[in-house]
């Protein structure tokens, strides 16, 4: 048995991650997708890497131009497929981390900074901050102040605050207008550590979030009531620190698990009935922080990604 395991390990080391078959290849659904985490890469529908960047990342998008917008702990970059940096913003002092990068409808870039002055920024193409307001994370724990903030079509901003157990909606001037609590008793209360990681406003007005240590994803109606949720009980324990999430055009939900390594299943797609319809255990996706599904069976996901 030991010799067989050694032989398998050596074989995998020789052929490399480029040719390791994935669970995703065994289903009728095929995706190309951007992974953001321990590795930063675009994986094709054939499960081969199409682009790999030099550093791990936290957040990002493939833009309509084909360039990739990326958030790192200390900076934001827009890079070409040739890895040329065409836009950048560096973390300001005295803050300690960056968590978000999103290209806004007006062409500027949304950035969030964590630290002694947690704030949401709008950055112009020349890297200058043209607008900002303070965030309300309710904690001095820098790393857990916030994650994937997003601008809404209304111009407001939806921001997940982990240790506040809350998703907060702010106006462009920083006024708090709505709060969705994630420490509800129906979700296990605060002991379940339902720390919100994503804050996704859906086309129907509901809000989707993934709840990290709570190992679940939840959809709230505009009043903050739970209308849909999926937990580890529904997926045979595949969730392990549910971080990134995306609602696809077909209504399915894709959810990533950050605490994964090697060939563990790190991303799954489920339908409304919570049936798993696609999985990825690609080595480049291990430790995924966030992701973006780009295509499904050759067809591009339309519009602004709901992620």
Language-model segments: residues:
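Sec/Tat signal peptide C-region and signal peptidase I cleavage site
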Residues: 20-24
């Amino acid at each position: 048995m030991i010799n067989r395991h050694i032989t398998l390990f050596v074989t995998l080391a020789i052929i490399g991650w480029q040719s390791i078959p994935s669970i995703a290849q065994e289903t009728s659904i095929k995706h190309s997708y951007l992974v953001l985490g321990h590795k930063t890469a675009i994986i094709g529908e054939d499960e081969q890497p199409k682009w790999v960047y030099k550093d791990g990342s936290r957040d990002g998008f493939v833009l309509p131009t084909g360039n990739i917008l990326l958030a790192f702990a200390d900076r934001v970059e827009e890079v070409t497929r040739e890895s040329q940096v065409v836009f950048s913003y560096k973390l300001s002092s005295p803050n300690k981390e960056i968590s978000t990068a999103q290209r806004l409808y007006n062409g500027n870039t949304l950035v969030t900074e964590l630290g002694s002055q947690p704030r949401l920024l709008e950055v112009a193409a020349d890297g200058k901050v043209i607008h900002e307001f303070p965030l309300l994370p309710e904690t001095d724990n820098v790393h857990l102040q916030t994650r994937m903030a997003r601008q809404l079509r209304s111009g407001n901003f939806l921001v997940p605050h982990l240790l506040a157990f809350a998703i907060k909606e702010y106006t462009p001037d920083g006024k708090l207008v709505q709060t969705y609590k994630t420490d509800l008793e129906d979700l296990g209360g605060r002991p379940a550590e339902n720390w919100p990681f994503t804050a996704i406003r859906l086309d129907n007005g509901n809000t989707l979030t993934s709840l990290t240590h709570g190992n679940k994803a939840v959809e709230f109606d505009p009043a903050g009531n739970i209308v849909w949720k999926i937990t580890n009980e529904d997926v045979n324990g595949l969730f392990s620190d549910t971080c990134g999430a995306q609602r696809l055009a077909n209504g399915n939900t894709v959810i990533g698990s950050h605490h994964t390594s090697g060939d563990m299943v790190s991303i799954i797609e489920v339908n409304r009935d919570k049936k798993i319809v696609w999985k990825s255990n690609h080595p480049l996706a291990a430790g995924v922080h966030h992701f973006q599904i780009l295509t499904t069976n050759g067809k591009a996901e339309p519009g602004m990604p709901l992620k």
